[in-house]
UniProtKB/Swiss-Prot annotation:
It is found in: Cytoplasm. The gene is gpsA. HAMAP family: NAD_Glyc3P_dehydrog. GO terms for biological process: carbohydrate metabolic process; glycerol-3-phosphate biosynthetic process; glycerol-3-phosphate catabolic process; glycerophospholipid biosynthetic process. Belongs to the NAD-dependent glycerol-3-phosphate dehydrogenase family. Transmembrane segments: none annotated. The active site is at K191 (proton acceptor). NADPH binds at S14, F15, R35, K108, A140, R255, V279, E281. It comes from Ectopseudomonas mendocina (strain ymp). The keyword Chaperone does not apply. Catalyzes the reduction of the glycolytic intermediate dihydroxyacetone phosphate (DHAP) to sn-glycerol 3-phosphate (G3P), the key precursor for phospholipid synthesis. This is Glycerol-3-phosphate dehydrogenase [NAD(P)+]. Pathway: Membrane lipid metabolism; glycerophospholipid metabolism.
Amino acid sequence: MTELQPIAVLGGGSFGTALANLLAENGQRVLQWMRDPEQAGQMRRSGENPRYLKGVKLHPGIEPTSDLGAALQQAELVFVALPSSALRDALQPVAAQLSGKMLVSTTKGIEARTFKLMSEILEEIAPDARIGVLSGPNLAKEVADHALTATVIASEDEELCLRVQQALHGRTFRVYASADRFGVELGGALKNVYAIMSGMAAALGMGENTKSMLITRALAEMTRFAVKLGANPMTFLGLAGVGDLIVTCSSPKSRNYQVGFALGEGLSLDEAVQRLGEVAEGVNTLKVLKARAEELEVYMPLVAGLHAVLFEGRTLAQVIELLMRGEPKTDVDFIPTAGF
């Protein structure tokens, strides 16, 4: 009997672990790689990932490992769940082993130095690989707890999309397909910025009207920026756009929301990130997004306002007051506008 070909999941964080568990529950053999041998050993011994996904029992079909080469050698389908700041350095040394494989990025971030999305970095490292992006309203703890969830696999490669759907689709996890890889990935990266602002608003006791305004204007702002870069605006009306934005801006389980909430409680940015204990991609994305928006002359007042709060000494209340003074323009459109 032929042994089942394993699927590799790169990353020992909360989402990588939830994804590995889901794959294993669907009958897949999973090699989950993490840089820290001690973490891999602890997960093998305890059957849990107490640092990033406490209280969730791991399926025995998961094989934690710190040997990246061995994990890649056996797998054809590879899910990449690494922080944006670490992805290039982690994978560049094993570029030859990535050639021809199906590489699916789950990281919702932007590389600060280059403003490249993770799938673009994967293409640079492994030009012959088949690239996809997995994104949507997918809080790791809820995926692990089998809450009803849907996601999007985006790629121009239809065979890759089908392979991912077959591997992940199950009783509580539904996988839709999209050909707009750029739009799906950009939506996942951009929404993290607005989740920080929503968390701050919640901590400061702002009303539901205010929260709703922030989310809907964030969607308009994200779409405006994405269209400027060539994305399909309709993508932002789906799971990877408004769906991901809503859950990230509304749930205390969201890492970026948690950072924003801590800031609203009076913690410094360093203290808020330290309390989280994990990477909050929105902080890094905010810095490069503001600069890129100015370079492209895209009107993004919420991004500029949050940057003023985090890095220029303004308060959220001051920024919102300035935004409310601005001249209102159109509500819903898919072309650049000059109004908040």
